[in-house]
Every structure is written in C-alpha cells, then in structure tokens.
C-alpha cells in the first residue's frame, strides 16, 4: 500500500507543481489524484481524477460534450505518458473523471457534478469505451 501511495504522489507531483492542465476547452483543470489499486470491469484500471469547476450544474460554463473532448485529451496527453512510467503491468483501462469539487473516491457526493469516461489502450492511444 505504501508503494502505491508513493507512486501516486510521484505521478501527481508534476501536475500539482504545474497547477492548471491545458485542455481544448480552456477550462481550468487540476489533478486531484490517481488511483491504481481499485479493479475495474476491464481488469487493472488506472483512474485519473481531475477537478474542473466549470462543469458545475449551477453556474458552470462547460457542458458534457465539451467536457468529453477534454477527457479524451486528458487520456491521450496526460494519462498515457504516465502509464509508460509505471512499474508492473500496464492497465487495461483508463478512467478519466472530472468533478466540479474535490470528492472522496467511492463516496456518493450528490452536490458534486461529475463526468466519467472509460478508455481502452490500443496502439498507444486511448480508445473510448461505453462505461
């Protein structure tokens, strides 16, 4: 468990130091965390969780279709390069999530707006999968 937490901190460190992560919509996006040790429906899954305040149901300016383009971008340009730096098996699936506020993984948070997309990794690219 300690090794997983250390790896998550190492992977998250550059994003936190850089602050905002560029996405096509231009909305402000920051990394909340990366979760490696929870299995998904496709087997080993890496979850990259981001904070994107502009998706908020009340007062947000980014709709789901725009956010979906941002999630595709985050998978291909942010998550994939970090998968290549891990030790051990490569995840079969990447889940990208956006939330308008920080949320605890696995805890129902009705006040949060959250979007999720799942991707298979094929030929070095993220391929959207129905979730």
Protein language model annotation of sequence segments:
Residues 88-131:
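Polar/charged, Gly/Pro-rich intrinsically disordered segments
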Residues 51-93:
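Mature extracytoplasmic domains of secretory-pathway proteins
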Residues 3-12:
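Sec-dependent N-terminal signal peptides
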């Amino acid at each position: 468990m300690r090794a997983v937490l250390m790896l998550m901190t190492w992977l998250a460190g550059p994003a936190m130091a850089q602050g905002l992560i560029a996405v096509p919509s231009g909305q402000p996006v920051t990394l909340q965390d990366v979760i490696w040790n929870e299995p998904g429906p496709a087997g080993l899954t890496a979850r990259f969780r981001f904070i994107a305040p502009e998706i908020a149901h009340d007062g947000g300016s980014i709709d789901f279709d725009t956010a979906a383009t941002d999630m595709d971008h985050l998978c291909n340009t942010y998550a994939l390069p970090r998968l290549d730096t891990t030790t051990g098996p490569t995840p079969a699936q990447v889940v990208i999530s956006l939330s308008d506020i920080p949320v605890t993984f696995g805890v129902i948070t009705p006040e949060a707006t959250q979007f999720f997309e799942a991707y298979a990794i094929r030929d070095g690219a993220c391929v959207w999968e129905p979730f």
